[in-house]
Swiss-Prot record:
Boundaries of every GIY-YIG domain copy: 19-97
Stretch forming the signal peptide: none
Family to which this protein belongs: Belongs to the UvrC family.
Alphabetical GO biological process terms: nucleotide-excision repair; SOS response
Protein name (database record): UvrABC system protein C
Record PANTHER family: UVRABC SYSTEM PROTEIN C, UVRC/OXIDOREDUCTASE
Entry keyword set: Cytoplasm, DNA damage, DNA excision, DNA repair, Excision nuclease, SOS response
Domain UVR: 208-243
Coiled coil feature spans: none
Function, as annotated: The UvrABC repair system catalyzes the recognition and processing of DNA lesions. UvrC both incises the 5' and 3' sides of the lesion. The N-terminal half is responsible for the 3' incision and the C-terminal half is responsible for the 5' incision.
One of the record's GO molecular function terms: DNA binding
Organism listed in the record: Legionella pneumophila (strain Lens)
InterPro entries tied to this protein: GIY-YIG_endonuc, GIY-YIG_endonuc_sf, GIY-YIG_UvrC_Cho, Hlx-hairpin-Hlx_DNA-bd_motif, RuvA_2-like, UVR_dom, UVR_dom_sf, UvrABC_protein_C
Length: 618
């Protein structure tokens, strides 16, 4: 044991630990989980934290806060790694390397429609729909670009099922040659299925297999004098070969993931390059939060590299075994490489190897990954140095004793009192946190009363935050002195203290740069110079709150108007309105429908159909 004074209870606990695989949770005196780890031998691993040889900065800081330890024994190392990964995602402990929840990264989803599957972007924490998923991708832009490529080459539909069912003629996607119009049966289910199978192979990186099959189908089409189909297949082959050239095809076959990692003070960057069928299919960057900002010892840097790699393995591979490749290539030796190989191979059902410092073609893959890693790190540092300097400028402006870790901003949006919505956006030291944004439908107030709307939104928000103990350091209100005073009254009534309340009011000309800042705690108002870093940060969060509010307001207003338009027709209630919208996909399509088409909707009589038709064709 080291010089840390352990309680008698904890010291006794350490002597009675089992020598079995499992996970351990280290807790502070308030019962908060500080760290979650896995072990092949719980007794050896947990006791190692209290050894004199363990002198790392992070370890000393962690051990000094441990009040108790909880363990869970598992049947195998594989089970331990899975449980560790799930607990880290759920608890987000302070001293673990934290990667963003896998479900918040976007995927490509191919639906399981029996005849004509749809391709779409999918990103949700809800239970996913059935079908095929591909990803995750580094961002929404990458997914959309890939979907457009799939539409151009394979002509897979991307419309919603309700819209698809309602079509009586091809849409614009058919006109611009991105869809084969299965909605009006311009293509048979059998031929559409071939296109879907090709799209799946494309997303799996099996371009050469597709090219061989397309070439054979083109040859058959020519022999049958079907030159129109042959021309379509020729264009597909041409586009696929162009993509192969852009991706850099190499001669080596096989699947591999190339992982390059760099750990810096405060963050780490993981560059994962996906190689399938010998070609670079994807390159994406991940930026986990490291558990300790000071890396002044070589032991800590190496330890964090290992921890980052293991965290990424759990995050990226263990939920989806289909993602595990034949080979994982890294830029640094792995302490537990044999153990990880065994776990991944078990999970996959066949061999997975980990290789360090490869040669030949594989070394070119690693060079590619490392070059992309350097670019990603440089971009991250540049972006976050700007964010940090802006946060520091705002802290100095507000004369705060501590760093600003979290800010929230509220805005109200409505059209002459109609469909009032309040938005709340959240920023932390990394920038915007979209997953924590909230919108509030405002009810029971006088239309157009912004003060009452703001009071209702802030009250609802902070009642929840008090329970979750997640209060912001700075609360920003997009509004004038009246709205800020209302919010101050709400906070006081809820017993919320130690929050800096700041109003951002548009100037007389409503021009950016002329905003008036209202600092309630000091009862003063002032205008910052246009080049102020603090002003730029406030403008950013204010504009984001406004964007989020107006988007939510427009959706609510459109929904309200559709409902009121249909329900103003005698005989159309909520159920029939829903049936009509589901059949036609929207109000505009319903207005274009013929009397005969409206009659086909379940629950709509001929007399009611005539009334609906006449409503749109007076």
């Amino acid at each position: 044991m080291n010089d840390l004074q352990l309680s008698a209870e904890l010291a006794l606990f350490l002597t009675k630990l089992p020598s079995e695989p499992g996970i351990y949770r280290m807790l502070d005196e308030e019962g908060t989980v500080l760290y979650v780890g896995k072990a092949a031998n719980l007794k050896k691993r947990v006791n190692s934290y209290f050894s004199k040889q363990n002198t790392g900065v992070k370890t000393r800081a962690l051990v000094s806060q441990i009040k108790s330890i909880e363990i869970s024994v598992t049947r195998s190392e594989t089970e331990a790694l899975l449980l560790e990964s799930n607990l880290i995602k759920a608890l987000r402990p302070k001293y673990n390397v934290l990667l963003r929840d896998d479900k918040s990264y976007p995927y490509i989803h191919l639906s399981n429609h029996p005849d004509f599957p749809r391709v779409e972007l999918y990103r949700s924490k809800k239970k996913p729909p059935s079908g095929n998923f591909f990803g995750p991708y580094p961002g929404v832009a990458a997914v959309r670009e890939t979907i457009v490529t799939i539409q151009k080459i394979f002509k897979i539909r991307n419309c919603r099922d309700s819209y698809f069912k309602a079509r009586s003629r091809p849409c614009l996607q058919y006109q611009i040659k991105r869809c084969t119009a299965p909605c009006v049966h311009y293509i048979s289910p059998e031929n559409y299925k071939l296109s879907v199978e090709d799209a799946i192979r494309f997303l799996q990186g099996k371009c050469q297999i597709i090219l061989d099959e397309l070439a054979e189908r083109m040859k058959n089409a020519v022999s049958q004098l079907n030159f129109e189909e042959a021309a379509v297949l020729r264009d597909q082959i041409k586009n696929l070969r162009l993509i192969q050239e852009q991706q850099g095809v190499v001669q080596l076959r096989g699947d591999a993931d190339v992982i390059a990692i760099e750990v810096r003070p405060g963050f780490a960057c993981i560059q994962c390059v996906t190689i399938r069928e010998g070609q670079v299919l994807n390159s994406q960057s991940f930026f986990p939060t490291v558990p300790y900002a000071v890396l002044d010892e070589e032991l800590d840097a190496n330890s964090l590299w290992q921890q980052t790699f293991e965290a990424f393995i759990g995050f990226y591979y263990l939920d989806t075994s289909e993602r595990i490749p034949d080979l994982i290539i890294t830029n640094q030796s792995i302490t537990e490489s044999r153990s990880l190989e065994y776990i991944l191979s078990q999970r996959r059902g066949k061999s997975c190897k980990i290789q360090v410092n490869p040669r030949g073609v594989k070394s070119r893959w690693m060079d590619f990954a490392v070059n992309n890693l350097r670019i990603s790190v440089a971009e991250y540092v540049s972006k976050h140095s700007t964010i940090r300097s802006r946060y520091q400028a705002l802290r100095q402006l507000l004369a705060l004793d501590k760093n600003i870790e979290r800010m929230e901003c509220f805005d109200i949006s409505h059209t002459q009192g109609e469909a009032t919505v309040a938005s709340c956006v959240v920023f932390d030291t990394e920038g915007p946190r979209p997953s924590e944004y909230r919108r509030f439908n405002i009810e029971g107030i006088t239309p157009g009363d912004d003060y009452a709307a703001m009071e209702q939104a802030v009250t609802r928000r902070f009642k929840r935050l008090i329970g979750a103990q997640l209060l912001p350091d700075v609360l920003i209100i997009d509004g004038g002195k009246g709205q800020v005073s209302i919010v101050k009254r709400v906070l006081t009534s809820l017993g919320v203290e130690d929050i800096t309340l700041l109003g951002v009011s548009k100037g007389p000309s409503r021009k950016a740069g002329w905003e008036k800042l209202i600092l309630v705690n000091e009862n003063r108002e002032f205008v910052l110079p246009e080049d102020s870093k603090a002003l730029h940060l406030l403008q950013h969060i204010r504009d984001e709150a406004h964007r989020f509010a107006i988007t939510a307001h427009r959706k609510k207003r459109q929904k309200t108007r559709v409902e009121s338009t249909l329900e103003s027709i005698e005989g159309v209630g909520a159920k029939r309105r829903q049936a009509l919208l589901q059949r036609f996909g929207g109000l505009r399509e319903l207005a274009k429908a013929s009397l005969e088409e409206i009659c086909k909707v379940q629950g709509i009589s001929e007399q009611l159909a005539k009334r609906i038709y006449e409503h749109f064709h007076p």
